[in-house]
Amino acid sequence: MLRRDPRKPLAILRHVGLLCATGPQRWRFQHSCAEEHSNCARHPLWTGPVSSAEGTRQSPINIQWKDSVYDPQLAPLRVSYDAASCRYLWNTGYFFQVEFDDSCEDSGISGGPLGNHYRLKQFHFHWGATDEWGSEHAVDGHTYPAELHLVHWNSTKYENYKKASVGENGLAVIGVFLKLGAHHQALQKLVDVLPEVRHKDTQVAMGPFDPSCLLPACRDYWTYPGSLTTPPLAESVTWIVQKTPVEVSPSQLSTFRTLLFSGRGEEEDVMVNNYRPLQPLRDRKLRSSFRLDRTKMRS
């Protein structure tokens, strides 16, 4: 079930890039509004302010039905992954991430809002401290307990992921909401190895894994031009957010919360609330591949 976001009220200081909030944080590293604006160690990957003052197409966003426009020209998204290209799962110090050999041209996505073929690079999750929140995107102000991101790069236009990640139309990210429900058998393969990567910078080898098993059966989606939600916040992403969530069990999500932001020998810092603040839509067009039906969304 969709839940109203308990994190409001929330204000982002656009000029200094620091965050003030009541309730749960949209970034786990929260600083006083009176603090000097500086790039201090909010997070080991962080190199800039919480909010990009110059950015005009930042992510994530609150997907509002009133802002969504049905586009009959949006084709179905074509998804074809090579399970054998899965390499390892690791704790990045911000989330756990599954890496793939992206030299395989055939493993990726095309169609939908995309003009080129995009190769799969990695996927990761964002989640909250409880089952009440955790997704990066929201829908009419409602959030899910977690969100999956499958990250792909434009192999037609760019030589490698690094160049694509900061280039125009360089990345395509599929977002999938996770909601509480039935046990997810395919996800369990990942959950089973999480104890081996509890600490930051630890990894475990993975056998074949096809991440299409994590996608919903219904492939209706919203799409909009946006950015990475972690530094460097590059505005290189075509977002493809699935309308239909996938079900996972409470125990599976609880295992996510056993991971740590901290490394071995450091004070334990539980890995939760690893999501970015919502960003304004501004004048961007939010398109949908489906005709809007509110009654079917709230499930």
From Swiss-Prot:
Superkingdom per UniProt: Eukaryota
Transit peptide (residue range): 1-29
UniProtKB keywords: Lyase, Metal-binding, Mitochondrion, Transit peptide, Zinc
EC number annotated for this UniProt entry: 4.2.1.1
Tissue distribution: Liver.
GO process terms (BP): gluconeogenesis
GO cellular component, one term: mitochondrion
InterPro entries: CA_dom (IPR001148), CA_dom_sf (IPR036398), Carbonic_anhydrase_a-class (IPR023561), Carbonic_anhydrase_a-class_CS (IPR018338)
Domain Alpha-carbonic anhydrase, chain residue ranges per copy: 30-290
Subcellular location: Mitochondrion
Record carries keyword RNA-binding: no
Effect of residue 121 to C: No effect on carbonate dehydratase activity
Cofactor requirements of the protein: Zn(2+)
Record: residues binding Zn(2+): 124, 126, 149
EC supergroup of this enzyme: lyase
Catalytic activity from the UniProt record: hydrogencarbonate + H(+) = CO2 + H2O
SMART domains documented for this protein: Carb_anhydrase (SM01057)
Summary of pH dependence: Optimum pH is 7-8.
GO MF term (any one): carbonate dehydratase activity
N6-succinyllysine modified-residue sites: 66
First and last residue of the signal peptide: none
Function noted in UniProt: Mitochondrial carbonic anhydrase that catalyzes the reversible conversion of carbon dioxide to bicarbonate/HCO3. Mitochondria are impermeable to HCO3, and thus this intramitochondrial carbonic anhydrase is pivotal in providing HCO3 for multiple mitochondrial enzymes that catalyze the formation of essential metabolites of intermediary metabolism in the urea and Krebs cycles.
Family stated for the protein in its record: Belongs to the alpha-carbonic anhydrase family.
Name of the protein: Carbonic anhydrase 5A, mitochondrial
